[in-house]
Amino acid sequence: MESQQLSQHSPIFHGSACASVTSKEVQTTQDPLDISASKTEECEKVSTQANSQQPTTPPSSAVPENHHHASPQAAQVPLPQNGPYPQQRMMNTQQANISGWPVYGHPSLMPYPPYQMSPMYAPPGAQSQFTQYPQYVGTHLNTPSPESGNSFPDSSSAKSNMTSTNQHVRPPPILTSPNDFLNWVKIYIKFLQNSNLGDIIPTATRKAVRQMTDDELTFLCHTFQLFAPSQFLPPWVKDILSVDYTDIMKILSKSINKMQSDTQEVNDITTLATLHYNGSTPADAFEAEVTNILDRLNNNGIPINNKVACQFIMRGLSGEYKFLPYARHRCIHMTVADLFSDIHSMYEEQQESKRNKSTYRRSPSDEKKDSRTYTNTTKPKSITRNSQKPNNSQSRTARAHNVSTFNNSPGPDNDLIRGSTTEPIQLKNTHDLHLGQELTESTVNHTNHSDDELPGHLLLDSGASRTLIRSAHHIHSASSNPDINVVDAQKRNIPINAIGDLQFHFQDNTKTSIKVLHTPNIAYDLLSLNELAAVDITACFTKNVLERSDGTVLAPIVKYGDFYWVSKKYLLPSNISVPTINNVHTSESTRKYPYPFIHRMLAHANAQTIRYSLKNNTITYFNESDVDWSSAIDYQCPDCLIGKSTKHRHIKGSRLKYQNSYEPFQYLHTDIFGPVHNLPKSAPSYFISFTDETTKFRWVYPLHDRREDSILDVFTTILAFIKNQFQASVLVIQMDRGSEYTNRTLHKFLEKNGITPCYTTTADSRAHGVAERLNRTLLDDCRTQLQCSGLPNHLWFSAIEFSTIVRNSLASPKSKKSARQHAGLAGLDISTLLPFGQPVIVNDHNPNSKIHPRGIPGYALHPSRNSYGYIIYLPSLKKTVDTTNYVILQGKESRLDQFNYDALTFDEDLNRLTASYQSFIASNEIQQSNDLNIESDHDFQSDIELYPEQPRNVLSKAVSPTDSTPPSTHTEDSKRVSKTNIRAPREVDPNISESNILPSKKRSSTPQISDIESTDSGGMHRLDVPLLAPMSQSNTHESSYASKSKDFRHSDSYSDNETNHTNVPISSTGGTNNKTVPQTSEQETEKRIIHRSPSIDTSSSESNSLHHVVPIKTSDTCPKENTEESIIADLPLPDLPPEPPTELSDSFKELPPINSRQTNSSLGGIGDSNAYTTINSKKRSLEDNETEIKVSRDTWNTKNMRSLEPPRSKKRIHLIAAVKAVKSIKPIRTTLRYDEAITYNKDIKEKEKYIEAYHKEVNQLLKMKTWDTDKYYDRKEIDPKRVINSMFIFNRKRDGTHKARFVARGDIQHPDTYDSGMQSNTVHHYALMTSLSLALDNNYHITQLDISSAYLYADIKEELYIRPPPHLGMNDKLIRLKKSLYGLKQSGANWYETIKSYLIKQCGMEEVRGWSCVFKNSQVTICLFVDDMVLFSKNLNSNKRIIDKLKMQYDTKIINLGESDEEIQYDILGLEIKYQRGKYMKLGMENSLTEKIPKLNVPLNPKGRKLSAPGQPGLYIDQQELELEEDDYKMKVHEMQKLIGLASYVGYKFRFDLLYYINTLAQHILFPSKQVLDMTYELIQFIWNTRDKQLIWHKSKPVKPTNKLVVISDASYGNQPYYKSQIGNIYLLNGKVIGGKSTKASLTCTSTTEAEIHAISESVPLLNNLSYLIQELDKKPITKGLLTDSKSTISIIISNNEEKFRNRFFGTKAMRLRDEVSGNHLHVCYIETKKNIADVMTKPLPIKTFKLLTNKWIH
């Protein structure tokens, strides 16, 4: 109701009074809240004038006409009752509206005066009078009274009323508009200040003096709500109040900041628009002022460009500087720096002239002695020749006289010239110089720059026979005290100080010189046209130029006033110091301080700054005249040159000389781009570009690596191409200083061919702009082409090639020609060009059958280099072809993506564009032979075998195992092609790694081959193999990559009416003998399976093994088949081609016979796991044996062993001494001591940062009350075992900050001083990985926190003492500890108990049983690692509530709140995590490894090819005796500790694929032979090469809301020393790898089955613990699975027969495993060995197998 009435009775008017106050305040630099009395009067005047112009309403009986002259009845406020504040007494609404006042505007509606609401208010006594409100109380801001047009006066106008009596406090007006809020805040703050509450209000320069009380907060809230109605508040104020309606202080602080910011910006713009400079202040001060304003505006988001800034500056120039814009009018691209350079030059010249003026001054006594003694101050003859202006010369001379009489301090240029001209000069009657000036009566001693002189120019005088100049700066070969007498036209003598040469450097690089005389006693610098004529230079006043007799223009002439001038910029400055041309008195100079001395004393500041400081007395004791400035100009301080060295500036257009000096193709720029990651091996990772300087013609070549021979091949190719195609020889090649260009091989090649290499300077990439810009342009085009076409990323270089062809054909805006035209080539025929990625149909000239479709869908890439064809990508064949046999696909909807490309590609336009080219082909078409191969050789694209073991189906469709009919034939009509078949995949399949992307020269394609064999060119032959497949399901022509890689399973839905045997062609793996298997019905299949008996013989090795998972069904373990399938679903298992199933009998469930005499598998024996696993071929595939690891170590053996087998016995010299040496090896120290970081640190900057960190740590220790500061103890009084040594350690963190930590020496702490039973717990890595995985699947927010000085929050129970820090200087004293100092044995446990108690009691958390440092409640999960916390929750507000509670007790910093929906990067416990909520998570350590590995001093990048696997099968560690010296042994063991320590850290964090190699080498840390070290180097090299790899997780999309926990187990029997087995396990949660383990079995197993049982039994306990943790954190059902590739192990687990257990140990192990499986509801399933990713944990694998097993989950 009140707000409605207010809106009815309070119309909003924007009065002029408030506007005037605002405009006045923004022009000042004072506090925006400071309203002075001077402003009050001015604002009152403006307000009165504004109000007098407003219309008034008729007067009312209730309210006077003008409330400024008559006050309404004051409010009667009763005495306080029942509390500190009075009771409210308000008029009702009807009473208020009778008088016409708004509801909140009437004084009697005020509950009590504001000063009475203040907590400082004291109730009045019986005789006290209540204060009366002023007559304008309660009126609206900028709103007139209902009866009057007068607006409410501003706060400044009422200041006198406020201060007139201490008992009167003027209330603020009522806010009526959001736009007036900031002005209202000013008045409101003044109201609070007058209410004695100013000390609780923050200002722009300081914080509040004290905290407010509850009563004061109530007062603020009440008055704010009373005078600022909510409907008139700005939105940002409402946002603050919506969070906390009592947070008035935040509103006031933000308002003050807004006012301060707005005021500063307006002041800066106003200052810039009103600049004024006339040379009265130093030029550097003016430059600093303007530069600061421009920088401040730019930082505030108001950039001022060069043109506008120069206009502001030039508009503010006056005096002699007003001619500067005229002198700069020819400069088009003028910058602020150039303009200030001219101002500085003019200022220095002006100061020099003033100093010279004071050097020649007559004394009155001299004038009395000789009335004819005077100096020449008249004008040149050219002035007097104008008869119309006879009096100008006299007036100008008078003005010059006024300037010259001003005394100025000497300057650095000509202060010593005074020595020869201080005495009066007597005129002589010689006529050596005739200047043609008329006689005047002036008695001026010296003339400064005249008002009509053009600064920085020479006056051209045709009547002068000699050239005169006032400054000695341009005189060359000067000689002092010349015997020359010079007079002017009035026969007056002109004193000459020196004679020399004036050297010119004109526009055409012409240099010439004339004689010049130096004198400071002339009005202008005169340039004699007679002397110019002597050197063949004349002045043409019609063209206003200086020119030679042949018409060559040398310099422009400027006409200013009545005279002609030429600029001094063509004068060459002299290298001779000024004193050499002056008569310097030795006694005078020796009394002055030399400038180099002052320069060094004043911190190597520049001369200009020093002089300015002396002139303004900021440096005292001596004056500016006490310094010898003669050497200031030419002085070069060597220390300044070294310490202040900067890069050179690149001048725009500096490369023009190269374009003018070289012919086309003689000067090339080159650069290399790359590498591009996550591409197949066959795709190029780099490209090298070349650009011709003159024509801008470009070439690009693909590169797979940056080796010397690869670069040399490209250089050889392009040089031969240029020589043969353009008949040109390359003379210079510009390149950067990369190792690929600076190597000796390339250097010799260039030297042999007479080519000059031009390298850029170190760290100067801008000098290589041509090549760098080209690479950037090509990459932009590449990304655009791939995005537009939807082609996979491995075709990126095709996009580069296409862009290069087009860019060479486009005209340059600068040269108006294309690069091809500059090179003399014809323009690009656009009719031969297709859009990149254009769908086409390519003719298949040699199909596999006559009824097979002849058209293959493809995508056009770019014209061929080697033929008249086009390069086309065929997704179905995984390769590119060079062909002319293609037809453009017309269907626009058959584009690569789902986007509408109608606006991008128009088929009608494309047909019209290519019509002529197609007709040309049709008219010249010849009969093609049947054996014509569409695959031609071309040098940068080729086949892409995404699935090397699958055949290339020209239909881009694989036959599904469930299809019942052969594929239907396709017609040749392109319009009938299935649109889904021409859609290219967006990403390359992860299995594409061993293929070749360059097309092969020749491939045989003979049909009906009974086997798939690898050809020399890397292709695969196609064959037809019948497959047992159901016939009931219909075949579809749509296929995808997913359908090709699906696991084959037996279908339970075979049709009963289909009993015919049908041979279905199917591809098979390479090297497999395939047979034609008749297709049968389901019943026949079951009969065959039942009646077949198990056998283990050689015949079984010829059949194919199961590539899919074979679940083992039992009533206890796997009651339903869908449960088994769900366990396998979504696991990152490798994709294998489908194979025929293996028939199994019921007897499979029986326990197989165990051969106790089975041979060691490492020596060639066959284990139990091979009993039912068929061997693909007796010969091992060549691809299985291929490896890229080139053994460069001469100690590596090549014996045929399966593993890196350690020796059976490690022999050393002095075994006991060696063990002692290991114990004495100190751990790696990554920190610095106090003396290293501060005392003896020579790096000053680093030392200062460490000192700052030191003081910060000390302050933190004192703040936390770490020790008792009240009492210091004597060392002799304290038990020594209770004294803990302490020290400061310093280190530099990964983020670049310097850290100091005061720690205790816990390593020497006495056992009696701590409880050994206490534990310092941290979160387990598996718990962290589990929490991260659940966060991804549940769309959780992840918040990372850090608690500063966490240990210091925990109290210490024991009585311990430490020595004080070094800065206290009390070495003999001790202080008692009160807090848990870092380094103490009990500090970690104390902190854990402290934070655990706080989280449980104050935050409502509970710790998960069995998992320390994992806390949870119904909404939030917390993982604690010492002082780091990671919070997980569905709702971010839940995390914020926990943070607020933590901040109440601890200094908590939010490292990453995790509120963004985009990708967020974390650094959690060493893991670099990239997380996009609801999509993916990537875990890696690239930055950390990039920083740490180079510090290990490992020889990275050894000779040989890049490693593709961490180890090589067939290598083992030699058993040779280790003979080492003791010191050498210590050093090598220390090195092994560092290397294996880092590798273990990385492996157990996320690189689980390396754990086998890490575990094997870790067993040899005490056996550091050369072979072991070399193998360790190879492992570190592989980690370095793959440091960018990441553990990839994607959000799971389960069919049912359940969690799936799976462990995959494997064992390698007897492959470790003493026939121990290696076991490995990988744990997966919802398809994401969360952990792995590889270790040597603790017991010796006697068979592979026993080893597998041991591996499984080791994995079950952790599997159960993880299951409990998952159920605690996520209340969903959980499915637990156990996968193994040992069928015999599965049969033992599910069998009830114990008779065949051969020993007690084996039986008890198996029985326990049975109980665990049944009791924990584990689903045990079989997984084929080829798909068992845990295989990488137990043995070294070939490269192909290693990649196949790991590329799905780490890449």
From Swiss-Prot:
It comes from Saccharomyces cerevisiae (strain ATCC 204508 / S288c) (Baker's yeast). The active site is at residue 461. Mg(2+) 2 binds at residues 1346, 1427-1428. It holds the Pfam family rve. Residues 660-835 form the Integrase catalytic domain. The gene is TY1B-BL. This is Transposon Ty1-BL Gag-Pol polyprotein. Mg(2+) 3 binds at residues 1610, 1652, 1685. Keywords: Aspartyl protease, ATP-binding, Cytoplasm, DNA integration, DNA recombination, DNA-binding, DNA-directed DNA polymerase, Endonuclease, Hydrolase, Magnesium, Metal-binding, Multifunctional enzyme, Nuclease, Nucleotide-binding, Nucleotidyltransferase, Nucleus, Protease, RNA-binding, RNA-directed DNA polymerase, Transferase, Transposable element, Transposition, Viral release from host cell, Virion maturation, Zinc, Zinc-finger. The lineage of its organism: Eukaryota, Fungi, Dikarya, Ascomycota, Saccharomycotina. SUPFAM superfamilies: DNA/RNA polymerases, Ribonuclease H-like.
